[in-house]
């Protein structure tokens, strides 16, 4: 099972993320640009859209993406270590729901160090050891992240791979990758917005029942 992070496990707007991503963009590209937000997309896809809107050519963007990912990740981990995150909100029933799944990993648009640092701070670090899942900066397309995550799980079959996410893009990407998806309405989208998922739950407390219903 592949868990999204923002809006699925983690419900707080992360100012550390915003600061680290923006300052890394200024370092690598010499400017700060913001573009249209597509909830559920990868960090690199968002940066590409923002820089395109600012007039950057695709080749120029591509040449700096790896440096941006590294700078962003380093800055985030450093800033987080100095930050008070007592206001951070873990999704309801997240620890219990994740812990009840035997084969689990993260599939998120966050770069790996960012995702793992967040999980550690939220108390979920031990449930998501490094070396599994797939992350932003490893692939720009969320669809391609599914293939990478399955490869890391020993070529786990797509037809028995289930994702958990809170956005329409989480769901459509899973389906385009040949996987199923449980939509969870703990982010900005309602259960009706997520109705094209294979199952929809109000929060992660309903995950076990949803998985039972999806099992032939």
Predicted regions and their residues:
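Active-site neighborhood of HAD-like aspartate-dependent phosphohydrolases
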Residues: 1-39, 45-48
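Asp-based, Mg2+/Mn2+-dependent phosphohydrolase catalytic module
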Residues: 59, 95, 99, 116-216
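Anionic, Ser/Thr-rich low-complexity intrinsically disordered regions
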Residues: 68, 107-109, 134, 138
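Short, basic/glycine-rich phosphate-binding loops at helix/coil junctions
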Residues: 71-80, 126-128
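Short, surface-exposed acidic
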Residues: 29-38, 55-68, 126-130, 157-158
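Helix-loop "lid/cap" segments that line or gate small-molecule binding pockets
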Residues: 22, 45-60, 149-152
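An amphipathic alpha-helix signature
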Residues: 18-22, 43-48, 69-73, 112, ...
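Short, acidic loop-to-helix structural element flanking the phosphoryl-transfer center
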Residues: 2, 78-106
